[in-house]
Regions:
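Conserved beta-propeller blade signature
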Residues: 31-34, 84-85, 134-135
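Loop/turn-rich, solvent-exposed surfaces of beta-rich toroidal or solenoidal domains
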Residues: 93, 117-146
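Hydrophobic/aromatic beta-strand positions that recur at structurally equivalent sites within the blades
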Residues: 2-5, 45-47, 97
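Short loop/turn segments immediately following the C-termini of beta-strands
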Residues: 37, 81, 89, 99, ...
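Gly/Pro-rich loop segments of beta-rich domains
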Residues: 7-22, 49-74, 100-124, 135
Length: 146
């Protein structure tokens, strides 16, 4: 859904329908990124273009734990280079997908769910600052990691 803050309307506009979206982000070039938890993928849409067919830019290879798969991708962060960071809930990891690559890199967690410093449990919100430091809301452990 999209709501314009300029005209004071309380009625939204459907941009993309029939999707199991959990997280979204918009980059500086006005691309919309969404996580589809049922399809286990991240798609990118041009906001000014055809919103019917997004491009799969990460995952989309069924549910799994390989570096080209997700198991319930949720929160997304997109950096200035259009690299995509994804919280992969059921794999208890955060992955980075370099723009244009077919496989991601595990940059946090991925050691099974747990509370050790190298583990995450249900990673949620995430942010990467200008110094490339990753911050993760580790929901299952009630903590913020960096």
């Amino acid at each position: 859904m999209q709501w314009s803050r300029r005209n004071g309307t309380k009625q939204g506009k459907i941009l993309i329908g029939d999707i199991d979206c959990f997280g979204l982000a918009i980059d500086h070039q006005r691309y919309l990124y969404i996580s589809d938890v049922k399809q286990h993928e991240i798609r990118r849409y041009q906001l000014e273009g055809d919103m019917k067919n997004g491009t799969v830019i990460a995952g989309g290879n069924e549910e799994g734990s390989d570096v080209n798969q997700f198991d319930f991708p949720t929160f997304i962060f997109v950096d200035r280079y259009q690299n995509v960071y994804v919280s992969d809930w059921n794999n208890h990891r955060v992955m980075k997908w370099i723009n244009g690559e077919k496989k991601g890199t595990i940059i946090a967690g991925g050691q099974g769910g747990g509370n050790a410093l190298k583990q995450l449990s249900i990673p949620s919100g995430l942010f990467v600052d200008e110094s490339d430091v990753l911050y993760v809301a580790d929901l299952g452990n009630s903590r913020i990691m960096c």
